[in-house]
């Protein structure tokens, strides 16, 4: 009887050992990518997240920089410009501005503003107004064109000479 118990315990021990020794391959250890790749990606993300200080307005092959505000409207505009330039038609209005529809809406935070020549303004959330004169109204400021003289600005915007094609870009 003792031999039977010994054999039983031996058989049970062998079965337990075999059950613990499966045929599953060990999980490979994958090294972390080099730290430099993470840094390059972080720098790319930071560059994309960084708000530029200027955008560019082009009319008839000539361009002017626009020093932009830091607000929701300009952040949305810059995000759109990172995808592609925006081109729209603008027309004279009131003898002091060129206005045109963007074909999209931007967030607005209108407040009473007295504009000056060179101001770039968001009106009604979906129109860009380029001022070569002055007006007081409730607008969201986008920025200010960097130009020489008032005559040069009026010439750039072709004030009083009909519609123009405006391209906004980074």
Model-flagged regions — what are they?
Residues 10-15:
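Hydrophobic helical h-region of N-terminal Sec-dependent signal peptides
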Residues 17-20:
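C-terminal motif of bacterial Sec signal peptides marking the signal peptidase cleavage site
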Residues 22-24:
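Bacterial signal peptide processing site
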Residues 30-62:
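N-terminal low-complexity, Pro/Thr/Ser-rich intrinsically disordered segments
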Residues 50-52, 61-63, 72, 116, ...:
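Extracytoplasmic
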Residues 52-95:
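N-terminal secretory signal peptides
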Residues 85-170:
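Glycine-rich active-site loops that engage anionic ligands at enzyme catalytic sites
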């Amino acid at each position: 009887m003792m031999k039977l118990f010994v054999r039983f315990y031996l058989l049970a021990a062998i079965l337990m050992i075999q059950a613990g020794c499966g045929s599953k391959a060990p999980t490979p250890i994958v090294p972390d990518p080099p730290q430099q790749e993470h840094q390059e990606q972080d720098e790319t993300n930071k560059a994309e997240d960084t708000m530029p200080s200027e955008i560019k307005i082009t009319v008839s092959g000539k361009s002017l920089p626009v020093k932009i505000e830091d607000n929701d409207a300009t952040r949305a505009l810059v995000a759109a410009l990172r995808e592609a330039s925006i081109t729209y038609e603008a027309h004279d209005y009131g003898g002091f501005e060129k206005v045109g529809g963007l074909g999209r809406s931007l967030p607005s935070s209108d407040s009473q503003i007295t504009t000056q020549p060179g101001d770039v303004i968001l009106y009604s959330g979906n129109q860009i107004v380029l001022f070569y004169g002055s007006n007081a109204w409730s607008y969201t400021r986008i920025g200010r064109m960097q130009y020489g003289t008032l005559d040069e600005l009026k010439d750039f915007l072709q004030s009083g000479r009909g519609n123009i094609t405006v391209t906004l870009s980074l």
